[in-house]
């Protein structure tokens, strides 16, 4: 089953009939318009390409305009692709609504996490700080040794060090679907999802459900 592209609206909470408070993220999933269907004969794999939302005409490049015109759909804010499972069929120009998730219990949500800028190891990797006193001078938040000796004589790849934090692709798995509001194009999932308000999210049925 394919996924859908939505936009993060924000967080709120809803109450069950028993009075239990459930924290939810509201995702606006406008109709995803099919712009291209890829097949084994022409592309070597089966997939569906979609767009959603809208984009100013002045912001649409000529190649994009041609691509959208060929599909007969309004220019959207981007293009996304989902692999097709055996038996799944879509046609160019078709609209796919949030009702796709009506029977889905859990979803995986992918987004771009909020950027935090250049961060040290304490904030970025949860390193513990060194002694506040006992002779420690100006080394309270430094990472400490990053290597060994003449052997191996190098710093290993992937070593946790200071650097850019956030602003990376993150997937949160197996979030409960609390409500599907097809009338208002809203999907409510339990818990938090990556990204800032207004950012794009890819919602797929959970692989571990």
From Swiss-Prot:
<dbReference type="InterPro" id="IPR019927">
    <property type="entry name" value="Ribosomal_uL3_bac/org-type"/>
</dbReference>
<feature type="region of interest" description="Disordered">
    <location>
        <begin position="132"/>
        <end position="153"/>
    </location>
</feature>
<keyword id="KW-0488">Methylation</keyword>
<feature type="modified residue" description="N5-methylglutamine">
    <location>
        <position position="150"/>
    </location>
</feature>
<comment type="subunit">
    <text>Part of the 50S ribosomal subunit. Forms a cluster with proteins L14 and L19.</text>
</comment>
<dbReference type="GO" id="GO:0006412">
    <property type="term" value="P:translation"/>
</dbReference>
<dbReference type="InterPro" id="IPR019926">
    <property type="entry name" value="Ribosomal_uL3_CS"/>
</dbReference>
<dbReference type="InterPro" id="IPR000597">
    <property type="entry name" value="Ribosomal_uL3"/>
</dbReference>
<keyword id="KW-0699">rRNA-binding</keyword>
<dbReference type="GO" id="GO:0019843">
    <property type="term" value="F:rRNA binding"/>
</dbReference>
<dbReference type="GO" id="GO:0003735">
    <property type="term" value="F:structural constituent of ribosome"/>
</dbReference>
<dbReference type="GO" id="GO:0022625">
    <property type="term" value="C:cytosolic large ribosomal subunit"/>
</dbReference>
<keyword id="KW-0694">RNA-binding</keyword>
<comment type="function">
    <text>One of the primary rRNA binding proteins, it binds directly near the 3'-end of the 23S rRNA, where it nucleates assembly of the 50S subunit.</text>
</comment>
<comment type="similarity">
    <text>Belongs to the universal ribosomal protein uL3 family.</text>
</comment>
<keyword id="KW-0687">Ribonucleoprotein</keyword>
<dbReference type="Pfam" id="PF00297">
    <property type="entry name" value="Ribosomal_L3"/>
</dbReference>
<keyword id="KW-0689">Ribosomal protein</keyword>
<dbReference type="InterPro" id="IPR009000">
    <property type="entry name" value="Transl_B-barrel_sf"/>
</dbReference>
<protein>
    <recommendedName>
        <fullName>Large ribosomal subunit protein uL3</fullName>
    </recommendedName>
</protein>
């Amino acid at each position: 089953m394919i996924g859908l592209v939505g936009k993060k609206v924000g967080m709120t909470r809803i109450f069950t009939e028993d009075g239990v408070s459930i924290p939810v993220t509201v995702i606006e999933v406008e109709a995803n318009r099919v712009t291209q269907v890829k097949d084994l004969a022409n592309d070597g794999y089966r997939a569906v390409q979609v767009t959603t939302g809208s984009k100013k005409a002045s912001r649409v490049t000529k190649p994009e305009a041609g691509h959208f015109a060929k599909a007969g759909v309004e220019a959207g804010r981007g293009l996304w692709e989902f692999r097709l499972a055996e038996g799944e069929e879509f046609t160019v120009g078709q609209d796919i609504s949030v009702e796709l998730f009506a029977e889905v219990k859990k979803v995986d949500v992918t987004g771009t996490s909020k950027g935090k800028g250049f961060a040290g190891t304490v904030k970025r990797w949860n390193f513990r700080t060194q002694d506040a006193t006992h002779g420690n001078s100006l080394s309270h938040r430094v990472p400490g040794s990053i290597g060994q000796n003449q052997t191996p004589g190098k710093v290993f790849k992937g070593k946790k060090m200071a650097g850019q934090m956030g602003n990376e692709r993150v997937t949160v798995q197996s979030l409960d679907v609390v409500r599907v509001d097809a009338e208002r194009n809203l999907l409510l999932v339990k818990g938090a999802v990556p990204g800032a308000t207004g950012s794009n999210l890819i919602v797929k049925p959970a692989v571990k459900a």
